[in-house]
């Protein structure tokens, strides 16, 4: 976070003021470090509209942006632990998962200053990761990126101790009638549990060409990229698909929810 950016959002805070009944759009940079060491940065948004909080990817307000992972957005009543998560599967079907996520925050006596704002450090074990979070008591918004809320001030930074994820506050804007609104009410999104959702992912991972394989077994002609496919061809294609998923699937913020945890191939 540079001094220029910090100064920009501090000016906005000073001019507009903040309250518990706020209408704010908070922009965070998220840096994700992949297992091969590759680092990817993107912008995510947290809209606080009175008693409602929406956390989402840039693609929901920026045309042409592609999804960066399976978890697309999170909606909740601000200050509560009841989250509704918008997710996709490998076939781009959309689902909604309702979760209760109570974070057991441990407040520390560690402080640092960002410009004139004093930040306090808090820690929590969440989603199979240990998290260090810096929040500002002077900004009485009990919110933050992803599911990191419930602290006595706005979250400025959140990072897991393995360095896989790092959220950094970029700036704060006022929400108004002229603000571009995210389209989170995805049509045909099906309500589902984490368990059933992970089973869908796992089943497709194990047999992504099930219909094509079964059709070929019945003697039907299957053509893929101008090549007639035999039953045995789908075995190699499946292994290639699985290798691609293991290499390219973005890390999960909640590592203990990753459907690949118990996969050995």
Where would I find each of the regions flagged by the language model?
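Extracellular or lumenal secretory-pathway regions
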Residues: 20-114, 118, 127, 131-132, ...
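Short beta-strand micro-motifs in enzyme catalytic cores
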Residues: 118-122, 154
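Exposed boundary/loop context
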Residues: 10, 15, 109, 143-146
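Bacterial Sec-dependent N-terminal signal peptides
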Residues: 1-26
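Structured soluble/peripheral alpha/beta segments that form catalytic or ligand/cofactor-binding pockets
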Residues: 25, 31, 141-168
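Covalent nucleotidyltransferase core used to form phosphodiester bonds in nucleic acids
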Residues: 96-99, 123-149
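Generic detector of intrinsically disordered, low-complexity, polar/charged segments
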Residues: 14, 19, 113, 147-150
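Homeobox/homeodomain signature
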Residues: 10, 16, 95-97, 159-162
